[in-house]
A protein has these predicted regions:
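C-terminal lobe and adjacent flexible extensions of AdoMet/dcAdoMet transferase-like proteins
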Residues: 277-284, 293
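Residue-level signal for inorganic ion chemistry
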Residues: 27, 62, 92, 126, ...
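Short helix-capping segments at alpha-helix termini
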Residues: 16-17, 134-136, 157-162, 233, ...
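Conserved Class I SAM-dependent methyltransferase catalytic core
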Residues: 217-280
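A short N-terminal interaction module
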Residues: 1-47, 51
Length: 293
């Protein structure tokens, strides 16, 4: 096994692939069907040729390993990913867990179904993991990309969540029907600034959808658009939660406080970045925008 692992690492290292050691072990696990125990015991890789061929393909294309595999791990599940969807990141688990916490709080007072809205669902990983872990919730997931919605639908079917998650093509709130409101709204919107986008790792910049990454107005474009309209769609006492990039949480908090919400949580990731902001709707909605931004 060590021989194969070293060969894979050399192929990746020679091609300038970042984190070659980590990716080599992923290849042995996912392509070579090697468990952690197998690796510790240095068991023989039975399909060495297939493993090396995958490593060479990764080296030649420079593509994200998840695209070549066709899936990404997220919260213990494998989600189909394509060039039309963002690859789920570990940090996004914080957003899911925050939403689950708010659902549980609301459930203590509300016996009915908890209605959840996921704006910009992409692969559907957030919507699916909320639906899987909150049996009292029903999720409406929106995305402007038809291709992303198709992938999200396939993920819901694969996880047997098709009855709990509804998908709808929508530019932010545009496809919502009159009177539709929600107890919890979540979004991991595009938030990369133009100057930062140009400096992204090429596996992100060249292979993941630009429309799901890049935001104008110093990365604040979609936070402003969503928060400006959110008061019409979040029930009184309900919550809205966002994932944020480094340095954005403070401005997101200010926008929320100016538009009928009271910030309840600012959650740091393992790097100490303020990654998730959550806020509670504290104004009774009259179906109008609260304040201009």
């Amino acid at each position: 096994m060590n021989e194969t692992l070293n060969e894979v690492k050399k192929i990746l290292t020679d091609a300038g692939i970042d984190e070659a050691s980590v990716k080599a072990r992923i290849i042995l696990r996912e392509v070579g069907n090697m468990s952690v125990e197998d690796m510790l015991l240095q068991k023989e890789v039975k399909n060495k040729d297939e493993v090396l061929a995958f490593a060479r393909k990764l080296a030649d294309t420079g593509a994200p390993i998840q695209h070549l595999l066709g899936y990404a791990d997220f919260m213990g599940e494998k989600f189909i990913v394509t060039p039309d969807t963002l690859i789920p990141r570990d940090e996004t688990e914080l957003l899911v867990n925050c939403a689950l916490d708010k659902i549980n709080k609301i459930s203590q007072k509300k016996q009915d179904t908890i209605n959840v809205l996921d704006i910009g669902t992409g692969s559907g990983c957030i919507a699916c993991m909320i639906a899987k872990n909150a049996p009292q919730a029903e999720v409406l997931a929106l995305d402007i990309s038809s291709n992303a919605l198709q992938t999200a639908l396939e993920n819901a079917q694969k996880l047997d969540l098709i009855k709990k998650v509804v998908y709808r093509k929508s530019d932010l709130f545009s496809a919502l029907r009159k009177g539709e409101t929600f107890d919890v709204v979540v979004s991991n919107p595009p938030y990369i600034r133009k100057k930062d986008y140009d400096n992204l790792d090429k596996t992100v910049r060249d292979f993941e959808p630009k429309s799901a990454l890049l935001a104008q107005d110093e990365g604040m474009e979609f936070y402003k658009k969503i928060i400006k309209q959110a008061a019409k769609y979040v029930n009184y006492g309900g919550y809205i939660a966002f994932e944020c990039a480094k340095g954005q949480a403070r401005e997101v908090c200010i926008l929320l406080e100016r538009n009928g919400f009271q910030v309840s949580d600012v959650i740091k990731d393992l790097s100490g970045v303020d990654r998730v902001v959550a806020a509670q709707m504290v104004l009774m909605s009259d179906n109008t925008e609260c304040f201009s931004i």
